[in-house]
């Protein structure tokens, strides 16, 4: 996810928070990754009551390895940054589905995931 405490990221995180039990029942855990610091993540977790871990990838190594760092458009301008992407990974560590940036509906993202895994 791109950034702690922004409207889209907050909506997405809260959707996942609210559906954590349903996702766990299907065998899925939730991890968030952004380039924000661990301190920023902790504040975000506390402010939103998040019930899952956030990884601080401040040098973007993991984001780049996942293909979730690259060129995007923001406010009509091209920039380099985090590409909002979700990977569904099974118990064997195999990616079974990828939600590309334009496919993610932040407010309803947990429902999108549940529809795929049901």
Give the predicted meaning of each segment.
Residues 1-118:
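Chalcogenol-based redox active-site neighborhoods
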């Amino acid at each position: 996810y791109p950034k702690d405490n922004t409207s889209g990221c907050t909506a997405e995180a809260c959707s996942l928070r609210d559906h954590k039990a349903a996702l766990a029942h299907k065998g899925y855990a939730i991890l968030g990754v952004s380039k924000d610091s661990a301190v920023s993540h902790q504040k975000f977790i506390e402010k939103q009551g998040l019930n899952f871990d956030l990884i601080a990838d401040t040098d973007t190594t993991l984001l780049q390895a996942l293909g979730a760092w690259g060129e995007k458009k923001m406010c009509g301008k091209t920039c380099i940054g985090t590409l909002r992407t979700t990977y569904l990974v099974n118990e064997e560590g195999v990616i079974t589905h990828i939600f590309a940036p334009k496919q993610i509906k932040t407010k309803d993202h947990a429902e999108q995931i549940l529809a795929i895994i049901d």
